[in-house]
Amino acid sequence: MNKKYIIAAMATSFALNMNAQSVKVTGTVVDSNNEPVIGAYIKVKGSNKGAVTDLDGHYTIDADKNATLVISYVGMANQEEKIGNRSQINFVLKDDANDLNEVVVIGYGQVKKGDLTSSISAIKGDKLEKLSTGNVMNALQGQVNGVQISGAGGPGASPRVIIRGVTTVNGSDPLYVVDGMPVGTNINFLNQNDIESMQVLKDASASAIYGTRASNGVILITTKKGKKGDAKFNVTATVGLQTLKKQNMADSQEYKKVYDTRYTNDGNVSPFKGSADTYTDWWKECINDVAVQQNYDLSFSGGNDKMIYSGSIGYYKQDSQYKVGQWQKLSARFSTEYNFNKMVKAGVDFTPRYEQWDDTPNLMSAIMAMDPTTPVMRAESEWTSNPYSNYERSHNNQEWNPVATMARMDSGASEYGLLATPYVSLTPIKGLTIKSAFGLNARFRRTDSFNVNFFIDNLEQNQNNNATRKMENWVDWNWTNTVNYMTTLNKKHNINLMGGYTMERFQDYWANAYSENIPNNDESLRYPSSGTKNPAATGTDSFTSLVSYLGRVMYNYAEKYYLTASIRVDGSSKFSKDNKWATFPSVSGAYRLTGEEFMKNQKVFDDIKIRAGWGKVGNQNIDNSAYLSSIGTTTYVFGGTPNRIIGSTVSGIGNTNLKWETVEDWNVGLDLALLQSRLKITADYFEKTSHDMLMKKDNLLILGYPMWNGQMWENVGKMKASGWELGINWNDQIQDFTYGVGLNLSQVKNKAVKLNGDYIWTGGFSGDYIVRNAEGESLSQFWGYKTAGIFQNETEVKSYTNEHGESLQPNAKPGDLRFVDLNNDGVIDSNDKTHIGNPFPDLMVGLNLNAAYKGFDLVANFYGTFGNDIFNKNIGRYAGTDGQNVYAGTYDKTWRTDNTGAEYPRLSVNDSNMNYKRVSDFFVEDGSYFRCKLLQIGYTLPKQWFNNKLNLRLSFSAQNLFTITNYSGADPEAASMGKSVTEAGIDYTGYPNPRTFLFGLNMSF
């Protein structure tokens, strides 16, 4: 009985105590202009209890007096308040520091995002970390408008990045600057988890401060730095599997049908060898079902009033989808900054790394073309002591056995690198900062390759094995000295001045050793010193240097009127003394309409800013000392003896008149923020024009120089790119549910304005060219014949005549393509060629979605291009024209007397009408695609489970999950790359982008 009374008393006491601690809290939420914030979410920290402000910004919530209220609203900074004994708590929300007040890195300085006058897109590193990739630029795809990123899927492959179109045939990659150190045009070495932010300088008014190397835009990368506080650790692990979509090739039965038909259509007997009952799945023999991708990272940071520090170590590995090949990299980073006193601080960013490749073969074309009736190996009774000679030769075409090719592969590379940027900064008076920074970017690479000797038959053999080793070192350094002064006069005149001087040196030296006849292809002797024949050694040492003077003035009045002007003067050793120096100026301005008094009382627009800018940037992407002629060694056979005599010859022709390529750029833009910054819109229109475009030209034979590859650098003309960009972003919060939608749209048109009256031909195809660049035309257009269907019968063939009754296609037969006499001169010849396709898209689209509810989060990123064409060389190659295997269903797609109205012309060994060997629109397909780049679902476990000491997030991701396209090839994105910007859109059957499924873990404590 006593127990019952005791329990009842305890329960009553507990209830009274709880009632005493629970209070009703009311209040009002307003913004910095004292306007009510509607829909702000007030939550009791550590619980699911919450409330939302009404139309007047009021809220009411019940909570424990020891609890803490957390208020959040999109576009504004979160606030926390402990309740204590208060029953009324009012909040004044300020703009989120990540919004207009966010600090954005610009060239040799930084500025508030709201004060930008140029076209600069900024993205935070946490968005880039979602997609697991070896090159962070793949993660940027679709995130920034005006930036076209096309990637291939091979291990270590670098994507092609084009910012606002192409204005030169001499490279398209932007300049990357990591923590103030220019590192060239490749950032494969960088650990994406180390990135704090990226800024894309898209117009010349922003990038002109980098002068000589900014013609293709500049991407500034800031790595993570330490912060004051206790040491924090973060562990990230991502492991997944990659798969390639299997190409649907014909089986042995269909292959034989197609092969035989090529001959019977010409009235010949098929020489088919082997048996259609034998089938080899070459895809299965060469391609793994899955390839493993791994990504691990450990980072730490912390600091105090005197010193901050951070560091990381990361490992990434991607296996090839082929049976051979892989790429891995190990990177580390350490960053520290020490404050000696209020005036002096110094720091260093130190990033060593190691990369290693086992070469991935380029065998997709051979795998698809290989005769499926051919076995992988010869019969054992035919084997020799050389295992590399025991593979079977293709029975019915000239393809080399791809399994044998992979077995013979023995090549790869390893590279050690170091990026270090120590600096010291002085602040002698308020607002004045003097900084001196030294940057070192060093790489040391060793490349080894061994070609075995083997004999399969007279067409597939190598009589002498050989070994090659190349040691190549690059050592670049940069010394930058800047002075910045910032001040505000009369509280309205904001001034930021910068002046500087830089020195840069780029050195490349290499040595190459070669020999032949390594005994028995011995794996332990595969290096040049083991060879007994034809030893050779070559090497060189070259360097270039750059000296620059730079300055910038930034002014704004009351954060309403803005003006920025910059100038950079560069001197480069790549040009002769008369053309060594170039000046790159820029000017930009902005007007904030919402800063006017008449805009104060409106509640729709939070920010309206109009921008305009103009500037010049340069390009010096040419050979070192291209203005100088050079002499090199060569060999020549004199008399009737086989002995080769070593001598000297002209190896390069200089051009003393060579001068800088410059790009003139102007841009107008509009930035809008509406509905309490939930909706943000950015729009830009731009034009870029290159002058004195640099290019190597094949004209030395005309000049009298007897060189097989006679080329000389020249300034050949002018190109233009123009277009528009539109970015729309919506972010909102409904209690515990937050979501965001981002849409990026952009269009760029490229045009060759002047080429000194010449054509630039690229993209070889059956002795002809696919691409023509001509004055007044769009860049890299496909140039060929128009077709008008297929001749269905002899009557149609005979009636296709000119006005004199002469046959326009005398070699044509029923089933052949009908080529159009475009100029109506009665003859079908090269004068009838015209534009048949455009490799560059009419529209680029990025769609980025995100949502979060309590511990769950979702990210979905999409990217697509529309209106671009692809020249699909594979249509002819895999239609059986030369005995290669064909796509499944080809037999039913090709014209025959019993299959008129077919999609493909008739098969023929002779192909006298050149259906499959003439550049025509028959090969051109719509290359548009829309791809789900990333779909990720994550869950963050409640922190209370770990005594509030650990954050743990688990995720599942699918990359390249699906692609919507009408393109018949393996991958429209990889195909759109071509080999260069002047061969964009030509499908060379490269490594497709794989579909990847990954599990991830992120832990911080």
Set out the residue ranges of the language-model regions.
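Extended, hydrophobic alpha-helical segments in both membrane/secreted and soluble proteins
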Residues: V177, I195, A332-F334, S436, ...
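Glycine-rich, aromatic-lined ligand/substrate-binding cores of catalytic
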Residues: N838-N872
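Outer-membrane beta-barrel "beta-signal"
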Residues: V587-A590, N993-F1005
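Surface-exposed loop/interface segments of Gram-negative outer-membrane beta-barrel transport/assembly proteins
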Residues: G114, K227-Y279, S320-W327, S331, ...
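Transmembrane beta-strand segments that form the barrel wall of outer-membrane beta-barrel proteins
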Residues: A237, I313-D319, L563-S572, W614
